[in-house]
Every structure is written in C-alpha cells, then in structure tokens.
C-alpha cells in the first residue's frame, strides 16, 4: 500500500496542472494522467500504469492533441493520440481517437468520454499481432477539480488482456 500511495503522489506531481485519475476494479488498479506541454495549443504527454492481479502489468506513454471538430458546432472535444503500450510479452504503437463531452442539461456537470486505439500487425511487436483498446467513462464533476466516474475498459493483443467495469476518481490541477 505504501508503494501504491508513493507512486500516486509521484505521478500526481509529474502531471501537475492537468489531471490524474485512479480506476479501481476487483482485479485491477489503473493510474492515468496527462500533462499539457504547449500553452498555446492543446498538446499533451500522457501515460498510465495498470496493475493486473491475474496477468502481467500494462503501461503506456504517448502524445495527444485535443480540440473542437472543425466545421461542427458540437458540445464535445475530440482528440487524436499516439501511444506506446507495453506488457511483459507484448508491445504496440497504436493510433487513437477520443471524445469528451459535458451534458449541460442537468444541474450538476455530467460527462461522458471515450477512446479507441488500434495498432495493426505492422505496429505490434513481440508476441502481439495487433492491439485494440476501447474505453468508455461517465461521471460527475461535483467540485471544480474533482470527479467521480464509472467506466468500461477492454484491452486486447492476440486475445483479451483486460475487460473490466471499474469505478474511479480524478483530479485536475
């Protein structure tokens, strides 16, 4: 537990002024964060570490750009990202898309967000012949810099590595 708390504090300080979140299920614990590296344009470095009690751990690091879709008046931000993902015997360089939207019809700020990342065989290494990650989250931001959410995550290399529903908390700095 001490190692987990220390890791959380270290990663939280690395991602200062942006966000860090913790996703918890019965068998997994994932810590994610992102850091804005450009103040004029929304360009980020991001990373995450998944502790899986049944399999080897999973880590990723990458870059992301985010903004409004050109020519569309939608209440959502879209993102493009490129990550490097790694487990004990698999690695890949997936390209991904994401969406993040707040639902303004309610008295408290509800949100929904999702990501999909894919790497074909040419971008998959070691024992992996492809990579696919799907993630959907929904929650409430009940204080200015804090949120609570539930989500679903599916990570696959040759076969399903992790498919789980989880709950989590997030903090922005």
Stretch-by-stretch model annotation:
Residues 5-10, 34, 66-68:
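Intrinsically disordered, low-complexity boundary segments flanking structured domains
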Residues 17, 29-30, 37-39, 64-173:
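Outer-membrane beta-barrel transmembrane domain signature
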Residues 1-2, 45, 112, 152:
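Short, intrinsically disordered low-complexity segments
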Residues 16-62:
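Short glycine/proline- and aromatic-enriched beta-strand/turn motifs that initiate or cap beta-hairpins
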Residues 1-19:
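Cleavable N-terminal export/targeting peptides
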């Amino acid at each position: 537990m001490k190692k987990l708390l220390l890791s959380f504090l270290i990663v939280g300080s690395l991602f200062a002024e942006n966000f860090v979140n913790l996703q918890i299920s019965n068998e997994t614990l994932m810590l994610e964060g992102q850091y804005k590296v450009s103040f004029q344009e929304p360009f980020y470095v991001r990373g995450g570490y998944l502790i899986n009690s049944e399999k080897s751990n999973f880590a990723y690091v990458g870059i992301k750009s985010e903004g409004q879709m050109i020519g569309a008046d939608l209440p959502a931000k879209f993102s493009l990202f490129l990550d490097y993902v790694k487990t004990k015997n698999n690695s890949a360089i997936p390209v991904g898309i994401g969406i993040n939207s707040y639902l303004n019809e309610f008295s408290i700020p509800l949100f929904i967000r999702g990501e999909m990342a894919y790497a074909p065989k040419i971008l998959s290494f070691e024992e992996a012949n492809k990579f696919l990650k799907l993630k959907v989250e929904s929650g409430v931001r009940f204080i200015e810099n804090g949120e609570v959410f539930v989500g679903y995550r599916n990570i696959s290399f040759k076969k399903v590595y992790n498919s789980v529903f989880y709950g989590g908390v997030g903090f922005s700095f």
